[in-house]
């Protein structure tokens, strides 16, 4: 096994079935790349990423655990977000929530 390798059955797989998702267009206005991991609270990402932060509150990237999305300088891309589950308590990141969503 290779670290990070996904071993799955054949066929199509759906991540986070039954959970609310949101599609957003995100623009990197910085002069450097910005990378966001799978479980980072998307509303608290680097301020140089331009998107509707209020809409992204309580959500993360809808990608496989441990994966990340990289935004190159000036790049605009569409991402899908998914609601955090469980107790929906967020600590850390940029310190903007520090508690229940």
Curated annotation (Swiss-Prot):
Keywords: Cytoplasm, Hydrolase. Pathway: Nitrogen metabolism; urea degradation; CO(2) and NH(3) from urea (urease route): step 1/1. CDD domains: Urease_beta. It catalyses: urea + 2 H2O + H(+) = hydrogencarbonate + 2 NH4(+). InterPro entries: Urease_beta-like, Urease_betasu_sf, Urease_subunit. Signal peptide: none annotated. Belongs to the urease beta subunit family. Heterotrimer of UreA (gamma), UreB (beta) and UreC (alpha) subunits. Three heterotrimers associate to form the active enzyme. This is Urease subunit beta.
């Amino acid at each position: 096994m290779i670290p990070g390798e996904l071993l799955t059955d054949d066929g199509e797989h759906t991540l986070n079935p039954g959970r609310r998702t949101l599609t957003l267009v995100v623009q990197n206005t910085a002069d450097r790349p910005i990378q966001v991991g799978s479980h980072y609270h998307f509303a608290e990402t680097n301020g140089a990423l331009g998107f509707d932060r209020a809409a992204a509150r309580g959500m993360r990237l809808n990608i496989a655990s441990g994966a990340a999305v990289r935004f190159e300088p000036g790049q605009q891309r569409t991402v899908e977000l998914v609601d955090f589950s469980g107790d929906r308590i967020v600590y850390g990141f940029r310190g903007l929530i520090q508690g229940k969503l």
